[in-house]
Curated annotation (Swiss-Prot):
Role played: Catalyzes the attachment of valine to tRNA(Val). As ValRS can inadvertently accommodate and process structurally similar amino acids such as threonine, to avoid such errors, it has a 'posttransfer' editing activity that hydrolyzes mischarged Thr-tRNA(Val) in a tRNA-dependent manner.
InterPro entries in the record: aa-tRNA-synth_I_CS, aa-tRNA-synth_Ia, Anticodon_Ia_Val, M/V/L/I-tRNA-synth_anticd-bd, Rossmann-like_a/b/a_fold, tRNA-bd_arm, tRNAsynth_Ia_anticodon-bd, Val-tRNA_synth_C_sf
Organism per entry: Gluconobacter oxydans (strain 621H) (Gluconobacter suboxydans)
Swiss-Prot/TrEMBL catalytic activity: tRNA(Val) + L-valine + ATP = L-valyl-tRNA(Val) + AMP + diphosphate
Entry-linked CDD domains: Anticodon_Ia_Val, ValRS_core
Complexes and interactors: Monomer.
Record text about domains: ValRS has two distinct active sites: one for aminoacylation and one for editing. The misactivated threonine is translocated from the active site to the editing site. The C-terminal coiled-coil domain is crucial for aminoacylation activity.
Residues that, per the record, bind ATP: K541
Name of the protein: Valine--tRNA ligase
Location(s) in or outside the cell: Cytoplasm
Transmembrane residue ranges: none
HAMAP family named among the record's database cross-references: Val_tRNA_synth_type1
One example GO MF annotation: aminoacyl-tRNA deacylase activity
Alphabetical UniProt keywords: Aminoacyl-tRNA synthetase, ATP-binding, Coiled coil, Cytoplasm, Ligase, Nucleotide-binding, Protein biosynthesis
Amino acid sequence: MLEKSFVPADHENALYDAWEKSGAFRAHPDQPGEPFSIMFPPPNVTGTLHLGHSLNFVLQDMLIRWKRQEGFNVLWQPGTDHAGIATQMVVERALDKEGTSRTALGREGFLERVWDWKQEYGGTIVKQLRKLGASADWERERFTMDDGLSRAVRKVFVTLYNEGLIYRDRRLVNWDPKFRSAISDLEVENHETKGSMWYIRYPLEDGRTITVATTRPETMLGDVAVAVHPEDERYADMIGKTVILPLTGRRIPVVADLHSDPEKGTGAVKITPAHDFNDFEVGKRHDLPAPTVLDETACLWIEEIRPELRDVEGLASVAFVETLNGLSREEGRKQVVAELERLEWLEKIEPHKLQVPHAERGGAIVEPRLTLQWYCDAKTLSGPAVEAVESGKIAFEPRQWENTFHAWMRDIQPWCISRQLWWGHRIPAWYGADGKVYVAENEQDAQVQAGEGVSLTQDEDVLDTWFSSALWPFTTLGWPDRTEELARYYPTSVLVTGFDIIFFWVARMMMMGLHFMDDVPFRTVLIHGLVRDEKGQKMSKSKGNGLDPLDLVAEFGADATRLAICAGTGPGRDIKLGRKRVEEHRAFVTKLWNAARFLEMNGAKPTEDFDPASVKSALGRWILTEANDAITEAGRALSVYRFDEYASCCYRFVWSRFCDWFVEFSKPVFAAENEETAELRAVSAHVLGLILRLMQPVIPFVTATLWQELGYPGKFEEIRWPEIMTVTRADEARAELDWVIRLIGDVRTVRSEMNIPPSQKAPLLLRDAAPENLERAKTWAEAIGRMARVSDVGVVGEDAPRNAAQLVLDEATVFIPLEGLIDLDAERARLAKEITRIEGEILKVTRKLDNADFVARAKPEVVEENHDRLATFQSDLERLKAALGRLA
C-alpha cells in the first residue's frame, strides 16, 4: 500500500544509490544500438551548484534518460574543469588565513596544496548533481588535469606549434594586476562608474595647442601620438605636425585616423598603444612605438620612457616624472592632474560615466597591458568551424544563435593561451641560456632537440583553462589513443550550454575537433537562457533574490525542482523561477501520487497481458486515445528541444485528462463491481504505467517509486518509452467524452460566474440537441449531476425558460434556470459594479502603457507586469460581460 503522501527525502537518496550500483547510468560502447552522447560542460572544480547549473544539467539529463528509453546506446560523459584562476584564488585565500602565501610555499609546495584541496573539496558539485538526479556515467568521470587529458593537452600544443599555429607574440591582453596574469574577456566584468573627463592642452612645436579629452590622464606618459579624423577640418593643417607631450617633453606626431570621432570630446584623442586596445590598433596602422608605463601591479613605471624624458620650461620636468615611478595608478593620476593644473595645461574637468573593467575573480580593475604571451592562430582554425555551421554539419538551436556565432567568428583575433599562474597545464616549452625555445611533450624530448650539455628551463606560464576545455569532446574519450569509446561516441550528439560561452568554448571546441578529429565535435548546439527570478530580474546576492537549488530540492524535492525548470524552458528565452513556481510543481507530483494511491485503493493493478485494442468502454477507449496523443506530442517536443511543450503536454494529460476527468468518471464504476469495473481497473493501471514512463525523464524519483511500489514488471531504469497503442473506435470515444467534458466545464463556468452556491444543485435543460448528444447526456447523467452540481437533465422546446442562464454547446442551447438559486437583481447589480471597476483599472493601465516616457524609463519587467495586468483585466471584463449577458 502506498504511503499517504510522497516525501522525496525518504526515497531520493536510496533510489539514486540503487541506480548507480546497478550500473543503470553506465555506457556500453561494445554493445549494439545507435549511439547518443552528451558531454558535460565541465563545471569548475571549485564550484557549488547554482540554478544556472541546474537548468543546464536538468535539460541534459532529460535528453539522456529519454534516449535510454528509446533504446539508444547512451553516454553522458561527466567531468570537472581545473578552473585555473578560480582555484588558485580559493587556495591562496586559505593560505592567507594561515598566515602564509603562494610565494612562501614555492611552486611545488603550492601545487601540492592545490591538489590536496581538490581532493578534499573538488567533488562538491558532483555530489550536488547527484542530488538533482543527474544520471551520468560517473565511473568515467574526467578532470581537465588528470594524466590522460594532460598528455593530450601537451600533444595538441606541440602539434599546433609545429604547424605554425601556436607562436609567441607581444600584444595587448586583459591584465589582472592582483593575480599578475593575463585573463580572458569572459573573466572581465564592466561596471558603470562615475568618473571624470580631463581636457588637456598639448602644445605643438609651432606654438599652437590641441586639446585632447581623456579618462586616463596618468597614461599620457606613454602617449606616442595625437589622432584626429582625416576629414575634421579643425585639425587638417595639424596633421603631420609635432606635439610636445606635457610632463615628459617627448615629441609625438599628430596623425590622421578614422578611430577619432569628431563628435566625441574634442575630436582629438591621445594614442597610448600599450594601454588601450583601440590605440594599439592605431599604433600598428601608423607604425608607432608602444612604451609601457604601468607595471604588472598597475603602478606607474617609467623605465621604457626614461631615455626620452627631457626638461621643457613650464611644460615638462624629468624630476617630476621620476617622482611618479612606483605610484599606484590612482595616486599617479592625482599627481599628474595636479601638475598639469599647476602648469596650466589642464583646460577643464567634466563629470563622466564610464565602463570600468573589473576582474570577475578578485574584483581588481583590469588593465590593457602589452606583454609577451603565447598565442593560437584562431583565424586559421576558425575556417572549418564556420564552414561546418554554414553547411549544416552543426546546427544551433534556436537558429538565431548562428548569427551570434558568425558575428564573433568574422572578427576573430589571435587567442592568448598563456596565463601567469601556477595552477594549470604548464606550457611544454623549454628555454636555453640564449633564450632559444624548444617545444616538446616532455623535457627529455626538449633536451634531444637542444642537444647534450644545454641547460634548459621550462616556461613558467600555464595554459588558458579554455585551451584544455576546447579539447574536451575527444580527449575525454581517450584521444590521442584510438579507443572504442572514441570510435563509438564521437562526434557527440548535442551540446547543451549557455549563450555567453558560444565563442569562448563552443567555437573553440569546433576548431579543435575539426583540426584533430577531422569531424565536428557535436551535431547540435542547444543554447538555453538565463535563470531569473519570478519578476524576470537577474538573480544576485545584492538583490537578495537568489535561490539555492539544493534548498529547493530539500524543501520541495528534486522532481518538483526539475519539473519547474523544464516547464519554464522555452527556445531563446530566459526562465523565470521562484519558490512559488517550484511549489506549484510539487502540487503536480502530489496530484500524481494521490491519483496512483486512489487507483491502488480501488484495486487497479498492472497486468502484463493487457490489450488496449480489446477495451470496450467509451471511457477506457477515450483515455487510451488521449494517452496516444500525449505520447506523440511529448516525443515530438523532446525531439525538437521544446522542454516547455513537453512539460505542458504531460501536465495537461496527467492533471486534466487523467486525474480530473478519467479518475472522476471512474469512481462510480469502481464502486459498482461489474464487467466494466475490471476493464477500467486494467485500463487505469496501464495508463498510469504509461504516465510513469512518459514522465521518467523529468520526474525520475516519484515515477520510479510508484513503478516499484505498485508492482509494475521490470526494472524502472530499463523501461522503454511508451509506444502508440491500437484503440478501437477511438474517434467515436473521443467525440463522446469530449462533449460530456465540455458540457460539464461550461456549466461549471456559468455557475461560477453567476455566484451559484456549490450546495445548490440546478437543473439543466437542452434545446435542439442532436439525438446522439441527448443519448450522451442520458448515459452520463450521473457524472454530469455529480461533477457539475446538476439536479437533473431535461429537454425544452422553443419556449425558453425565464430567468435562466444560457450557453451554446455545438448545435444545442443549454439553459440553467436560476429562479430560487440566486437573487437575480442583486447579482445583476454586483456584475455591473464589478464591470465598472474593471473598466477603470483598464483605463489606468492603458494610460500608463500609452505614456512613452513611462515605457522608456520603467524597468522592462515593470512594463511587462503592466501588460500582464492589462491582459488579465481584459479577460475578466469579457467574462463579467458574458455573465451579465446571460442574465439579461
